[in-house]
Curated annotation (Swiss-Prot):
Its job: May play a role in sperm motility, especially in the regulation of flagellar function.
Swiss-Prot/TrEMBL catalytic activity: L-seryl-[protein] + ATP = O-phospho-L-seryl-[protein] + ADP + H(+); L-threonyl-[protein] + ATP = O-phospho-L-threonyl-[protein] + ADP + H(+)
Region spans: Disordered: 359-399, 464-509, 531-576, 617-640
Domain called Protein kinase: residue spans: 24-271
Highest taxon of source: Eukaryota
Designated name of the protein: Sperm motility kinase X
One family name in Pfam for this protein: Pkinase
Composition-biased stretches (Polar residues): 359-381, 390-399
Record's keyword annotation contains Lipid biosynthesis: no
PROSITE patterns linked: PROTEIN_KINASE_ATP, PROTEIN_KINASE_DOM, PROTEIN_KINASE_ST
Top enzyme category: transferase
Length: 640
């Protein structure tokens, strides 16, 4: 008889194992409990790790079926998900979601206690999970760190609803159940209690234990612990924030009627900083709206779409539904682990494309074309570092700064950006330049192309101090800078155009090196031209506005044709004077030298010393008589 029974048990165990191993591969044992054991297994189709709770069918496990029904009705990100149920003659295999992070108790024992920030995060997730259960009329009745698991991201997963039950509004429970240190005071009274209030008390004990690493009600005997719980006295010698102590005090209120509900807890000040709403379920509305991508994938595996919908609609929790839920879970993990763009970087990229008034160091690309030509207002402060001189530049409103009216379009001036300042005149050496251009005494005038002098908004113009510019000059002639007076009285959507014919500068090259640094960019060139030759600053009268004095940057004229791209990224060279002008200058200099040798004996009344070593003829009249005199290079001749 005993031998026959042993054979029957062997056949039964073989059948039981086959029902399980047909879909899962057992890996190891996770734990052993009073009612059964938990195995770690791998799903053969999706290779998903799962936890399988093996519960033998017996009178002791009369609560297995209520737990299964509760798990079937729960679908929340912070609650362990039921995946598959295998019911055999001897055992019930409950396939659950596997939380790789282990128990919360192990985490607390490892670190002693948790930081308040971590307590805040985990406690909020617990509140959301418990709020979801209470809304469905389910009470846990065994909240403790051993029944709180952590997933691969460290998030809470509430598990073990073996002592849980479903209640209706106003229903009282009479069964004493739970773990003693986490039991509420009303459980020790001989009357009914509210299951929701007991869960809130246990939640307060868990929060206290996370923040301190100690149980609030502890003792060496059952009676000692019971008396402390009924009295509601617990140590407050730990260094916690006042807000956290306030939450603990409200949760551990002895009177269950004065104890807050989970909805009240969610509105506590300690839980409100991040304004995070309760997370949605991962499997919400899967019965009526299955994921199309998962349906296609399961179709490739050989599953019938109609069978999939039927299994989800009726919540069979069979092999078909288990495969769908595992694929859904993997899809959710992939979406969370996918790297997304950083909002702060995008914000910096967006801000980098917008105009700003802050001084920043930036690089102008060769492909970026300035929309408006602008003046530059450099700061007076300059720094010298490692042979480099840097100047900070500010941007002025877009104004027209061209010398050729025919080739340069007009630019409208925005009234909001115009800084009203009137620069009446500029002093350059001893020569005064008025608002209208004047020709020099030699009658020489140069044709200048349209130059757009502008600065990089929010950037620094950097020029090297040295002989780089002098080497790049070659045979080019020294050309004076062109200064214009800016009048911005008409700012309301008007176009300003001015034709400027600059005079020839009498300043020597030695004096020209004493000016400020500047940046010159032409209409066709996109690169920054770092130059060493500079111009003296403007002096202004009756200035309207604030800021440093306007300092015009020196420019070197070039042919208009070359401005369209032939000199892209290169320095401009100054064209030589016309051939007839050079011949006339040579003849004139020879004539002056001949007259000087012939008339050396005449009395000298005044000599002229040009500052720029150029041959200039100055006409003057005599102070004492009616006859004028003509002076050539310090030699006075009688006027005819």
């Amino acid at each position: 008889m005993k031998r026959w029974q042993a054979c029957q048990d062997l056949r039964s165990n073989t059948f039981e194992d086959a029902a399980l191993t047909e879909h899962y591969e057992i890996l190891t044992t996770l734990g052993q409990g009073t009612f059964g054991e938990v195995k770690l297994a791998s799903h053969l189709v999706t290779q998903t790790k799962v936890a399988i709770k093996i519960l033998p069918k017996s009178r002791k496990n009369s609560l297995v079926q209520p737990e299964i029904e509760i798990m079937k009705s729960l679908d929340h990100p912070h609650i362990i998900k039921l995946l598959h149920i295998i019911d055999t003659t001897r055992n019930i295999f409950i396939v659950l979601e596997h939380a790789v992070g282990g128990e919360l108790m192990s985490r607390i024992e490892e670190f002693g206690y948790l930081a308040e920030v971590e307590c805040h995060r985990l406690f909020k997730q617990l509140v959301y999970a418990l709020q979801y259960c209470h809304e469905k009329g389910i009470v846990h009745r065994d909240l403790k760190p051993e029944n709180i698991l952590l997933d691969h991201r460290g998030n809470v997963k509430l598990t073990d609803f073996g002592l849980g039950t479903k209640i209706i509004m106003g229903q009282k429970l009479v069964t004493f159940c739970g773990t003693l240190p986490y039991c509420a005071p009303e459980l020790f009274e001989d009357r009914g209690y509210d299951g929701r209030a007991t869960d809130v008390w246990s939640l307060g004990v868990v929060l206290y234990f996370m923040a301190t690493g100690c149980l609030p009600f502890n003792g060496y005997s059952y009676e000692a612990i019971k008396q402390k719980i009924i009295a509601g006295k617990y140590p407050r010698s730990f260094s916690l924030s006042p807000e956290l102590w306030e939450v603990i005090a409200k949760l551990l209120t002895v009177n269950p009627g004065e104890r807050p509900t989970v909805h009240d807890i969610a509105r506590f000040k300690w839980l409100k900083p991040d304004n995070e709403a309760s997370p949605a379920s991962l499997g919400e509305n899967i019965e009526s709206h299955p994921d199309p991508s998962i349906m296609v994938l399961m179709g490739v595996m050989g599953y019938n779409p109609g069978e999939i919908r039927e299994s989800l609609r009726e919540k069979k929790f069979d092999q078909v539904m288990a495969t769908y839920l595992m694929l859904k879970q993997q899809s959710a993990w992939e979406n969370k682990t996918t790297k997304k763009p950083d909002p702060r970087l995008c914000d910096r990229m967006l801000r980098s494309t917008e105009p700003t008034i802050k001084n920043q160091t930036s690089v102008r690309r060769a492909s970026s074309v300035p929309t408006h030509s602008t003046f530059s207002l450099p700061n007076e402060s300059e720094s010298l570092e490692k042979g480099k001189r840097t100047t900070m530049s500010h941007s002025m409103p877009p104004t027209r700064n061209c010398f050729n009216e025919e080739t340069t379009p007009l630019h409208s001036i925005c009234p909001q950006l115009v800084q009203k300042a009137h620069y009446r005149r500029s002093i350059w050496g001893e020569t005064e330049i008025s608002d209208t251009s004047e020709e020099s005494s030699t009658g020489e005038s140069l044709e200048h192309p349209s130059l757009k002098i502008h600065t990089l908004q929010t950037s620094m113009g950097v020029s090297k101090a040295g002989s780089t510019y002098s080497k790049s000059k070659g045979s080019s002639q020294c050309v004076s800078s062109h200064h214009t007076s800016v009048e911005e009285d008409q700012c309301e959507g008007t176009n300003i155009s001015r034709e400027i014919n600059p005079p020839l500068s009498p300043v020597s090259p030695q004096e020209n090196l004493m000016g400020q640094l500047h940046i010159v960019t032409t209409a066709g060139s996109m690169d920054i031209m770092n130059t060493q030759v500079t111009s003296p600053p403007f002096s202004r009268k009756e200035a309207k506005g604030e800021g440093p004095a306007l300092q015009q940057r020196e420019s070197r004229p070039s042919s208009p044709n070359t401005l369209q791209g032939h000199l892209h990224g290169r320095r401009q060279t100054v064209p030589q004077a016309p051939f007839q002008r050079r011949v006339w200058r040579t003849l004139r200099n020879g004539l002056i030298r001949g007259l000087r040798t012939l008339c050396c004996c005449l009395p000298i009344e005044r000599r002229v010393h040009p500052t720029n070593n150029r041959d200039l003829a100055v006409s003057q009249k005599s102070h004492g008589g009616s006859h004028g005199i003509r002076a050539f290079r310090g030699t006075v001749l009688p006027e005819k």
